Structures are given as C-alpha cells and as structure tokens.
C-alpha cells in the first residue's frame, strides 16, 4: 500500500482580550481594551444623531477616565514589602507608578508607590516607605494608576472619520477634533480585495505616515506600509469597487492639551477655579454648530455643579474648507492601544 498523507484544514483566529462589563451596582459600563498591541475597543450608539441646519447639538456624558481597582487583601509580613491581591485583574506591570488609598488601620500602606513585582493577574507587590505595624490592612482599599503610555481613553461624539472628544493618554488630557476633509494630492488606483494602493502623481512619503488613517470612497483604511511616493499598503483590504482616479483624504486629529485650553485649563488657576481630577467621575459636556464653519465647545460641570465650557475650536475665517465631512455623529467611548501599553487602562461610563 502506497504511503498516504492526510491533512485537516485548520484555521487560527485571534481572540481579543478586551471586554465590556455591565456594572449592576450603579448602572454603568466598564470598558477594557486588553493588553494586545494596537487593539481598539469601542462602544458606540447605534444611531447617528442628525444635524439640522440652524440648530446646535449638545452632548453630556458621565465618565471616569482613570477608575480605581478594588483591592481584596493587602498584607505585609513584617517588612516594607507589601503584597496586593485585587478583586479583578489589575492590569499593571513592573515599574508602574500607582496610588493606593483607603487603608484605615495603618496609613503606612497608603501613598504613591512603584510596582516592585507582578506575581499574576491578581497579585503584585510594592515597597512602602516603612514597615507597617499592621500585618493586614483594613478599610475600603483601592488604587489608581498614576500614569501610563501606549493607550488612549476617549469619550465624546465621533467615529473613525469625524467628531470631537476628550482623550486621556495616561499623562495629559486633550480636547480633540477629528476631521477627514484633507485631500491628498494626486489620485489613486484601487482594486477590490487588495490592500495595495497605487498612486498617480502622488507624494505619499511626505503626505502620509505609517499608522495614518485615510478615507477612500467613504471607507476608512489604516496605512501600514509606504513603499514609495506611488505605492502604499492599507488595512483592511479595499472593500469597494475597483477604480482609478480616486481621491484619497487623510483623517487628522487636532489635539489641544489641557494646559493650552483657551478658556480655562482646569488646573485651579483659570477663570472658573475648576481643578480637573481624572481619577474622579466627571460630567463632560460638548456642543457644536456645523454649517461647515461653526464652533465646537468642550466643558465640564465645575465644583459648584454648573456647566462651564473650558475650550472651543473656532473655524470661520480660519480654515479654508468645512471642518467635518458630515455633521451627523454618534455618541462613542473608546480605548485604543497605540502600541504595547504599560498598563491595561479602562474607563467607566454611565448614561448612554
């Protein structure tokens, strides 16, 4: 009998580590993107809110950009080394800075520290400033990450092509306007099912960069490779009808950091005296008028519970074209890992 070879057709699927978790205790939702590099998790309204000429739209949302992690046990075995066991996966790595609070029987446990070692998804250690007198800490104990890199937390009215939102990158808060009206010079040839885009009289090495988002015939594509001025590769593969002479537009996020907000920097020194604490739940507000040249405003409820707008984007007499492709926008929350994050950030939101 001749030797026979058999094979079974197999496939490998990536499994996302992100999650949406309903919070039945307060009606909120917890979102995590997981630890996978370059992963994104999004929660968006099914409906796009239709902009009507002559009217503005206001959006409000309750959000915590850097929520706490609940500590289950906190102990010290007669030394300054403290062992933390969390109720849920802590998501932090060795060397991360965090602030622990809520210990009532020995304040030596409380404070800002650096993670010394990570045992597993639920246990890590840190070195306190001294040796706690109490072996086991008591109280409603929790911790916040002090900073991170490689991930952004967002909330506002936006999609992949247009919109506005707050963005927290682990260190700074930003007001962001997203627009996809910038046309790239030259034209492109696109083929259905192919990720290769060929240009005609294009200058893609100077007008695009790897990681940029583009819009081709209404669909968003991410630039993953720039071969030369006339050839780029995008993901996902082009989904539309094969064509030539196609205009490519670039998605641009215009970011203004908190210390440059033009009404109040929300650090306690501005006109409203409001000091933004990203570790606390916030009522965030946005409103906008479009007409192609309207204005976008960003705000919060201040220390007196009053809505105060802290930054705005003006467009009339400044831009040369409309600041959105469309004024129709959804409400949206999102966490994006732009590399390998130093922690697994999450956000809490309520309402929408």
Positions of the model-derived regions?
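Extended, low-complexity, turn-rich repeat/linker tracts enriched in Gly/Pro/Ser/Thr and Asp/Glu
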Residues: 65-69, 106-108, 290-294
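Solvent-exposed serine/threonine-rich low-complexity stretches and specific carbohydrate-binding patches
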Residues: 113-115, 311-318
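Small/polar beta-strand repeat architecture
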Residues: 70-96, 101-144, 182-252
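Amphipathic alpha-helical scaffolding segments
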Residues: 156, 296-312
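Short, aromatic/His-centered strand-loop micro-motif at the edge of beta-sheets
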Residues: 253-283
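Low-complexity, Ser/Thr/Pro/Gly-rich disordered linker/stalk regions
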Residues: 1-69, 144-181, 253-259, 315-352
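Localized edge beta-strand/strand-to-loop motifs within extracellular or lumenal beta-rich domains
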Residues: 279-295, 301-303
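Extracellular/lumenal carbohydrate-interaction signature centered on repeated Trp-anchored short motifs
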Residues: 48-58, 90, 273-280
């Amino acid at each position: 009998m001749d030797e026979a070879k058999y094979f079974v057709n197999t496939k490998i699927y990536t499994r996302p580590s992100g999650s949406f978790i309903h919070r039945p205790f307060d009606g909120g939702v917890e979102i995590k993107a997981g630890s996978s590099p370059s992963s994104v998790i999004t929660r968006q309204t099914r409906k796009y809110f239709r902009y009507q000429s002559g009217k503005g739209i206001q959006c409000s949302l309750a959000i915590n950009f850097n929520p706490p992690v609940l500590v289950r046990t906190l102990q010290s075995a007669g030394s300054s080394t403290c062992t933390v066991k969390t109720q849920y996966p802590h998501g932090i790595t060795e060397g991360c800075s965090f602030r622990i609070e809520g210990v009532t029987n020995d304040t030596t446990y409380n404070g800002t520290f650096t993670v010394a070692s990570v045992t597993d998804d639920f246990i890590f250690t840190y070195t306190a400033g001294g040796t706690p007198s109490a072996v086991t800490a008591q109280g409603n104990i929790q911790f916040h990450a002090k900073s991170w890199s490689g991930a952004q937390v967002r909330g506002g009215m936006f999609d992949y092509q247009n919109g506005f939102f707050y963005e927290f990158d682990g260190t700074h808060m930003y007001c962001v306007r997203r627009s996809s009206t910038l046309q790239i010079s030259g034209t492109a040839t696109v083929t259905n099912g192919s990720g290769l885009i060929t240009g005609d009289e294009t200058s893609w090495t100077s007008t695009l960069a790897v990681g940029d988002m583009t819009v081709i015939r209404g669909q968003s594509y991410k630039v993953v490779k720039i071969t030369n001025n006339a050839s780029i590769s995008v993901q996902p593969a082009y989904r539309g009808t094969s064509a030539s002479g196609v205009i490519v537009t670039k998605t641009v996020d215009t970011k203004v950091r908190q210390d440059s907000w033009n009404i109040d920097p929300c650090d306690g020194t501005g006109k409203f005296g409001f000091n933004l604490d990203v570790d606390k739940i916030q009522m965030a507000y946005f409103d906008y008028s479009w007409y192609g040249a309207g204005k976008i405003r960003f705000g919060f409820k201040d220390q007196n519970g009053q809505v105060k707008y802290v930054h705005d984007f003006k467009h009339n007499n400044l831009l040369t074209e409309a600041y959105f492709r469309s004024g129709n926008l959804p409400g949206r929350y999102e966490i994006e890992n732009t590399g390998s994050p130093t922690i697994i950030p999450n956000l809490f939101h309520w309402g929408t």
